[in-house]
UniProtKB/Swiss-Prot annotation:
InterPro entries in the record: Ribosomal_bL34 (IPR000271), Ribosomal_bL34_CS (IPR020939)
Organism classification: Bacteria, Pseudomonadati, Pseudomonadota, Gammaproteobacteria, Oceanospirillales
UniProt GO MF annotations: structural constituent of ribosome
Biological process, per Gene Ontology: translation
Family per record: Belongs to the bacterial ribosomal protein bL34 family.
Keywords: Ribonucleoprotein, Ribosomal protein
Pfam family, one: Ribosomal_L34
Protein name: Large ribosomal subunit protein bL34
Keyword Ribosomal protein: yes
Amino acid sequence: MKRTFQPSVLKRKRAHGFRARMATKNGRKILAARRAKGRKRLAA
């Protein structure tokens, strides 16, 4: 059986990147929560 994690930078950025987060209301909510928590990295 192959491993389930087959990394792709493009897919990663499109699904979890900063611009993907900013594109939706809930995505902006995630970023706000991560800022409030003091995360060093906000998005992938």
